[in-house]
Amino acid sequence: MVRRFKRATKYRRGSRTHGWGRVGQHRKSGGSGGKGMVGFHKHKWSLVMKYGESGTGWPFYGKHGFKQPETISVEWRPINVGRLAELVKELRERGEVREEEGRLVVDLLKLGYNKLLGGGHMDVPLVVYTPVASKAAVEKIAKAGGEVRIVSLVHR
């Protein structure tokens, strides 16, 4: 391809700065006031005042928080003890609960829940497998003659 201009190094031989003004203006970070965030409390304060939030100086200063990765965070799907007592009849008809030593065994993870809360009234003796249960829920199920067994959050 044809070159339509001459290189500056070629036609500026002997000029010392090759079109960059005074000596040192085309060197590293000296002409721009330093590298990166240098000087925002000194000679670049006008940039903070112009582009930063008033009062806080964000995004130049201060803590900026932390966004937890979605792979770590758990989406809780709770169910109350009272609602579980209502569901037991339906679950029994569908065959999603089994009987063990005169008590019904319910796995909340298989039902789509991962937390047991203590709202409502429980009168059915149940053995409940769940990753998380509140203190009130454990007490109500124990009072009805059942028990809560804590399992891993990973689906079995």
UniProtKB/Swiss-Prot annotation:
Signal peptide: none annotated. GO terms for cellular component: cytosolic large ribosomal subunit. InterPro entries: Rbsml_uL15_N (IPR027386), Ribosomal_uL15 (IPR030878), Ribosomal_uL15/eL18 (IPR021131), Ribosomal_uL15/eL18_sf (IPR036227), Ribosomal_uL15_CS (IPR001196). Belongs to the universal ribosomal protein uL15 family. This is Large ribosomal subunit protein uL15. Gene3D superfamilies: 3.100.10.10, 4.10.990.10. Keywords: Ribonucleoprotein, Ribosomal protein, RNA-binding, rRNA-binding. PANTHER family: 60S RIBOSOMAL PROTEIN L27A, LARGE RIBOSOMAL SUBUNIT PROTEIN UL15. Part of the 50S ribosomal subunit. SUPFAM superfamilies: Ribosomal proteins L15p and L18e. The gene is rpl15. GO terms for biological process: translation. GO terms for molecular function: rRNA binding; structural constituent of ribosome. Binds to the 23S rRNA.
